[in-house]
């Protein structure tokens, strides 16, 4: 695809196109990172990107960047064509979607699939090899359910969803529209509910369900448990990385993003647009407000107000954590001084 055609594509997109400088209208065949790009490839560079220092070593034919005079001047000196937008990352995502076409699965049901006679399958669905679909399950239109996945009984799936290989969707789960569940994830498994009695554990039956709204994406090897009663709920637009654990009865708001190894204990309530970095843990029944950001390995043991940026274990405001960390580094020196004072 000619670079000028990619410029036209970006103009029509959501990155807020500003201008372009094309030194040679080459055919763009591929995309790559800034330090790995070669001739006939396109890359991107954000204003705060740590790869700025590697710009003079890049062999990219074109670079998408922000309206930064320093970067634009450097690109001109290097004779690298550039496309200037407000949000380079979004523009690059749009280019990737165009250059790398998504694999489309042909509608149809594979001969090895096992589908209960009471299940209902909508139009234009792809049901892959060794898929199981249980009794009274209803699946909407244009869904791709790939190899080895199991959809148990009384499940409701909307339209335009992709369920990747070897996923399990347990009974009493609802999945709305335009969702993606990546491989080996389990939706609606039994919640971790046991009652202590006489030095033993009595199992609490987990008879609830899971409801996942539209445009949710779930990474690989995630587990979303169902509660004893009621539902575990994930609102629209939320994104889960790989290896995320959502406990029974958890309620998660809209457009949240949870990185790998986040764990949320049963009954917690997470607001809208919450960002949890890697390995954040949320205690049971804790309420986390809207627009909260929690840094990596943060331990959230109490309710968090809207808009807070928190860090540490136990979680505290980020500024307090930074001060505490600074003091923590000095503890050996302070302890030594205290011992010296004790001897006086």
Curated annotation (Swiss-Prot):
One of its GO terms (biological process) is lipid A biosynthetic process. GO terms for molecular function: N-acyltransferase activity; structural constituent of carboxysome shell. GO terms for cellular component: carboxysome; membrane. Signal peptide: none annotated. It catalyses: a UDP-3-O-[(3R)-3-hydroxyacyl]-alpha-D-glucosamine + a (3R)-hydroxyacyl-[ACP] = a UDP-2-N,3-O-bis[(3R)-3-hydroxyacyl]-alpha-D-glucosamine + holo-[ACP] + H(+). The active site is at residue 248. Pathway: Bacterial outer membrane biogenesis; LPS lipid A biosynthesis. The keyword Repeat applies. Keywords: Acyltransferase, Lipid A biosynthesis, Lipid biosynthesis, Lipid metabolism, Repeat, Transferase. Its EC number is 2.3.1.191. Belongs to the transferase hexapeptide repeat family. LpxD subfamily. Catalyzes the N-acylation of UDP-3-O-acylglucosamine using 3-hydroxyacyl-ACP as the acyl donor. Is involved in the biosynthesis of lipid A, a phosphorylated glycolipid that anchors the lipopolysaccharide to the outer membrane of the cell. Homotrimer. This is UDP-3-O-acylglucosamine N-acyltransferase. The lineage of its organism: Bacteria, Bacillati, Cyanobacteriota, Cyanophyceae, Synechococcales. The gene is lpxD.
């Amino acid at each position: 695809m000619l670079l000028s055609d990619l410029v036209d594509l970006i103009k029509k997109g959501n990155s807020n196109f500003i201008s372009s400088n094309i030194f040679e209208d080459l055919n763009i065949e591929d995309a790559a990172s800034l330090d790995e790009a070669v001739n006939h490839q396109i890359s991107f560079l954000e204003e705060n990107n740590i790869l700025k220092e590697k710009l003079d070593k890049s062999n990219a034919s074109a670079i998408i960047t922000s309206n930064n005079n320093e970067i634009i001047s450097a690109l001109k000196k290097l004779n690298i064509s550039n496309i200037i937008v407000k949000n380079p990352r979004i523009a690059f995502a749009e280019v990737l979607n165009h250059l790398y076409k998504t694999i489309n699965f042909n509608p149809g049901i594979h001969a090895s699939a096992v589908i209960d006679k009471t299940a209902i399958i909508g139009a234009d669905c792809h049901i892959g090899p060794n898929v199981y679909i249980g009794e009274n399950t209803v699946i909407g239109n244009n869904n791709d359910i790939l190899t080895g996945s199991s959809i148990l009984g009384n499940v409701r799936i909307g339209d335009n969803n992709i369920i990747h290989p070897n996923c399990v969707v347990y009974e009493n789960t609802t999945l709305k529209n335009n969702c993606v569940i990546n491989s080996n994830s389990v939706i609606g498994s039994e919640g971790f509910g046991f009652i202590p009695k006489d030095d033993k554990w009595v199992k609490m039956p987990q008879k609830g369900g899971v409801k996942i709204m539209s445009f949710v994406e779930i990474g690989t090897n995630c587990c979303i448990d169902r509660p004893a009663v009621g539902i575990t709920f994930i609102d629209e637009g939320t994104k889960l990385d790989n290896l995320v654990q959502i406990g029974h009865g958890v309620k998660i708001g809209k457009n949240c993003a949870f990185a790998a190894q986040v764990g949320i204990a049963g009954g917690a309530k997470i607001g809208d647009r919450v960002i949890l970095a890697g390995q954040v843990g949320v205690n049971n029944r804790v309420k986390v407000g809207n627009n909260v950001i929690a840094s990596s390995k943060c331990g959230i043991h109490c309710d968090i107000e809207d808009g807070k940026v928190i860090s540490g274990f136990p979680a505290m405001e980020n500024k307090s954590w930074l001060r505490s960390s600074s003091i923590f580094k000095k503890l050996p020196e302070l302890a030594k001084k205290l011992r010296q004072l004790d001897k006086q």
